[in-house]
C-alpha cells in the first residue's frame, strides 16, 4: 500500500466535495505537509488557483475574493505557524460574513507534543472564531469515503457566514508516483464523481420574516441608518427611505449615495440631534458603522423601536436598544416591507447637510488627505470599484465625501485592523476583474508590503494610493498623552514607497499637486497594470482639517 497515493485520494475527495458548495477560488501557500491537498487542488479543473508565499496575506487575499464572489473560498497551508497566520482573516470573515474554508495540513497524532519539527496543536487553535471546526483523522481506508464527504457536506451545507477550519493530518511519505492504492475506496462513491451536487444536501430554511405591524410603523417618524451592504442593496435602500420621507444616514460602505452627505459633521450639531430625537422608530440596515458622531448618536438615541436588519447572525447593537434584531437579506426584507409615499418630516437636517458639504468644498483646493477624501468620488474608475483602508482614511472619506449610489465599495470594517489591506484589495480585484482604486495609509501599506507581489497580477487597472502622513495620525484625533504621542502612538517611520514599488516592478508616482495626480490617474486607467501613487502630505493636516470642520459645522 502506498501512503502517499492514498493521501492524495483522500485529499481529492475533500477538494471535490468543496466544488459542490460553490468553491471556485482556492489560495495555496508553499509547504510540504500540504502536498496531498495542493496536488489534489492542482488536478481539479474546477478551481481557479492563487498562490502567495505569505500565509497572512494569503488569508486576506481569500477574504477579498470572497467579498466579491459571494462564494466560499478555500485556503491551503502547511502545518505549524503557517496555520496561525490565517487567524486575522478568519476573524474578519466571522465579523463581516465572508465564507472561508481553511484546509490546514498537520502532522499525524504520534508527532504532536513530542518535539517533532513544525508540529503544533492545531485542532481548536482558532477557538470560537470558526463557524465549524473539523479535525479529520489520519487518512485510512478503514473510514469509508462517504463519511469523509458527508462530514465536509454537513459543515459547508449549514454554513451561512464565517469560516470553516478543516484540519488535515497526513503521514509520510508525502511524495511518490500514483498507484492503485485506494481506488476501490474512492469508487464506492459511485456516480457522485460525475455529478455536481453534494453527497449530503442540507438546506436550512432562512426566510425573511414579515413584521406584521410594519404598516403601522411606516406611518411614523422614522430614521434609516445604512451600514455595510451591497451596491444593489444600497440603491434600493436610498429609494425606500426617500419614498418614506425618512432621513437616511448613510455610512461610507452603504453605497446609498449618501443623500444627506457629511453626516459625521452635521451630527455634531445640536439642531440635528434635536430634530432626530423626534424619531419614533430607527431602522438600521446593515452593520459596521464608521463615523464617530454617528456611533455616538446611535448609542444615545431612544426611539420607541430600534430595528437592525442584517444577514449576519448575532448581536450587532453595542448600545443594546429595545427593539428587534432581524436576520434577513436586506433586499428581501425591503421587498416584504414596502415603503408608503410620505412627505419628509425633517426640515433642519437637509439644510445642515448642504451647509456642511459647502464648508468642505470651500477647503478642497489644498493638497492634503482631507481634500483627497472629499475628491475621491471624482477619481473613481468607470465601471470600477473602490477599496478603502482603515484608520484615518476611511473616517475622512466617510465624513467628507459623497460616493455615487450603487458604486461598489469594499473594506475590512469587521475588526477594522490595518493588517492585510493590500492583500484583500488584490482579492477584490481578482474576483471582479474590474478597475480598482484602493486607498490606504502609510502604516497600513508597510504592514502588508509583501502583498505588492500580489498586485503584479491584475486583470484590469489597479491604482493604489498610499496617503503618507508619516505615522498613525488617527491618534491625533484621540486624547492621547501629548508627551508620548509621537513615540508610542504615531510611530512615524520616515519612509517612502518608491523602492518598494520598484522591487515588485510596479509603476510609481509621487504627485505634488492635483493636476499631477489627475494626469497620473488618467494614464493609469488605460493599462491593466498596478500603479502605486504615493501622496505625501503634512503630518497633522488631515486630522486638523476634520477637527476644524467639526467645530465649524457644530455652530451652523
Curated annotation (Swiss-Prot):
InterPro entries from the UniProt entry: MenaQ_synth_MenD, MenD_middle, THDP-binding, Thiamin_PyroP_enz_TPP-bd_dom, TPP_enzyme_TPP-bd
Enzyme class: transferase
Cofactor note: Binds 1 thiamine pyrophosphate per subunit.
Cofactor: Mg(2+); Mn(2+); thiamine diphosphate
SUPFAM superfamilies in UniProt: Thiamin diphosphate-binding fold (THDP-binding) (SSF52518)
Keywords of the record: Magnesium, Manganese, Menaquinone biosynthesis, Metal-binding, Thiamine pyrophosphate, Transferase
CDD domains per UniProt: TPP_PYR_MenD, TPP_SHCHC_synthase
One of the GO BP terms on file: menaquinone biosynthetic process
MF GO annotations: 2-succinyl-5-enolpyruvyl-6-hydroxy-3-cyclohexene-1-carboxylic-acid synthase activity; magnesium ion binding; manganese ion binding; thiamine pyrophosphate binding
Pathway recorded for this protein: Quinol/quinone metabolism; 1,4-dihydroxy-2-naphthoate biosynthesis; 1,4-dihydroxy-2-naphthoate from chorismate: step 2/7; Quinol/quinone metabolism; menaquinone biosynthesis
Enzyme Commission identifier(s): 2.2.1.9
Catalytic activity line of the entry: isochorismate + 2-oxoglutarate + H(+) = 5-enolpyruvoyl-6-hydroxy-2-succinyl-cyclohex-3-ene-1-carboxylate + CO2
Function as written in the Swiss-Prot or TrEMBL entry: Catalyzes the thiamine diphosphate-dependent decarboxylation of 2-oxoglutarate and the subsequent addition of the resulting succinic semialdehyde-thiamine pyrophosphate anion to isochorismate to yield 2-succinyl-5-enolpyruvyl-6-hydroxy-3-cyclohexene-1-carboxylate (SEPHCHC).
The family this protein is said to belong to: Belongs to the TPP enzyme family. MenD subfamily.
Subunit structure: Homodimer.
Protein name: 2-succinyl-5-enolpyruvyl-6-hydroxy-3-cyclohexene-1-carboxylate synthase
Organism: Escherichia coli O6:K15:H31 (strain 536 / UPEC)
Amino acid at each position: 500500500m502506498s501512503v502517499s497515493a492514498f493521501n492524495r485520494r483522500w485529499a481529492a475527495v475533500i477538494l471535490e466535495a468543496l466544488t459542490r458548495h460553490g468553491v471556485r477560488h482556492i489560495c495555496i501557500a508553499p509547504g510540504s505537509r500540504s502536498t496531498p491537498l495542493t496536488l489534489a487542488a492542482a488536478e481539479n479543473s474546477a478551481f481557479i488557483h492563487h498562490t502567495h508565499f505569505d500565509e497572512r496575506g494569503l488569508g486576506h487575499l481569500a477574504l477579498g475574493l470572497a467579498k466579491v464572489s459571494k462564494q466560499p473560498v478555500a485556503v491551503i497551508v502547511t502545518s505549524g505557524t503557517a496555520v496561525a497566520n490565517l487567524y486575522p482573516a478568519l476573524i474578519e470573515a466571522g465579523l463581516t460574513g465572508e465564507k472561508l474554508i481553511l484546509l490546514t495540513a498537520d502532522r499525524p497524532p504520534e508527532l504532536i507534543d513530542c518535539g517533532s519539527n513544525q508540529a503544533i496543536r492545531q485542532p481548536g487553535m482558532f477557538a470560537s472564531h470558526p463557524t465549524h471546526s473539523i479535525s479529520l483523522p489520519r487518512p485510512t481506508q478503514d473510514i469509508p469515503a462517504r463519511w469523509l464527504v458527508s462530514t465536509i457536506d454537513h459543515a459547508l451545507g449549514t454554513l451561512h457566514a464565517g469560516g470553516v477550519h478543516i484540519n488535515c493530518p497526513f503521514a509520510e511519505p508525502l511524495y511518490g508516483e500514483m498507484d492503485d492504492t485506494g481506488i476501490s475506496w474512492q469508487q464506492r462513491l459511485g456516480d457522485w464523481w460525475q455529478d455536481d451536487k453534494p453527497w449530503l444536501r442540507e438546506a436550512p430554511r432562512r426566510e425573511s420574516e414579515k413584521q406584521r405591524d410594519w404598516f403601522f410603523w411606516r406611518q411614523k417618524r422614522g430614521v434609516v441608518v445604512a451600514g455595510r451592504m451591497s451596491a444593489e442593496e444600497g440603491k434600493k435602500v436610498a429609494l425606500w427611505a426617500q419614498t418614506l420621507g425618512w432621513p437616511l444616514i448613510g455610512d461610507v460602505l452603504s453605497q446609498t449615495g449618501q443623500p444627506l452627505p457629511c453626516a459625521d459633521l452635521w451630527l455634531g450639531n445640536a439642531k440635528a440631534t434635536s430634530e432626530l430625537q423626534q424619531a419614533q422608530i430607527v431602522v438600521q440596515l446593515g452593520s459596521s458603522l464608521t463615523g464617530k458622531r454617528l456611533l455616538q448618536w446611535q448609542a444615545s438615541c431612544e426611539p420607541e423601536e430600534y430595528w437592525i436588519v442584517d444577514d449576519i447572525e448575532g448581536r450587532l447593537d453595542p448600545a443594546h436598544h429595545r427593539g428587534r434584531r432581524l436576520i434577513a437579506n436586506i433586499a428581501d426584507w425591503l421587498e416584504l416591507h414596502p415603503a408608503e409615499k410620505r412627505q419628509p418630516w425633517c426640515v433642519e437636517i437637509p439644510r445642515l447637510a448642504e451647509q456642511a458639504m459647502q464648508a468642505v468644498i470651500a477647503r478642497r483646493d489644498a493638497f492634503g488627505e482631507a481634500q483627497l477624501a472629499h475628491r475621491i468620488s471624482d477619481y473613481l474608475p468607470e465601471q470600477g470599484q473602490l477599496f478603502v483602508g482603515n484608520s484615518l482614511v476611511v473616517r475622512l472619506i466617510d465624513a467628507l465625501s459623497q460616493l455615487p449610489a450603487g458604486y461598489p465599495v469594499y473594506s475590512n470594517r469587521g475588526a477594522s485592523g490595518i493588517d492585510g489591506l493590500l492583500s484583500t484589495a488584490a482579492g477584490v480585484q481578482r474576483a471582479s476583474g474590474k478597475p480598482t482604486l484602493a486607498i490606504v495609509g502609510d502604516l497600513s501599506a508597510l504592514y502588508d508590503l509583501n502583498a505588492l507581489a500580489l498586485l503584479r497580477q491584475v486583470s484590469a487597472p489597479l491604482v493604489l494610493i498610499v496617503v503618507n502622513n508619516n505615522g498613525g495620525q488617527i491618534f491625533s484625533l484621540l486624547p492621547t498623552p501629548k508627551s508620548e504621542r509621537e513615540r508610542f502612538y504615531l510611530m512615524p517611520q520616515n519612509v517612502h514607497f518608491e523602492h518598494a514599488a520598484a522591487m515588485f516592478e510596479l509603476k510609481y508616482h509621487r504627485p505634488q499637486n492635483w493636476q499631477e495626480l489627475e494626469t497620473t490617474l488618467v494614464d493609469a486607467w488605460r493599462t491593466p497594470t498596478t500603479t502605486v501613487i504615493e501622496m505625501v502630505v503634512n503630518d497633522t493636516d488631515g486630522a486638523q482639517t476634520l477637527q476644524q470642520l467639526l467645530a465649524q459645522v457644530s455652530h451652523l
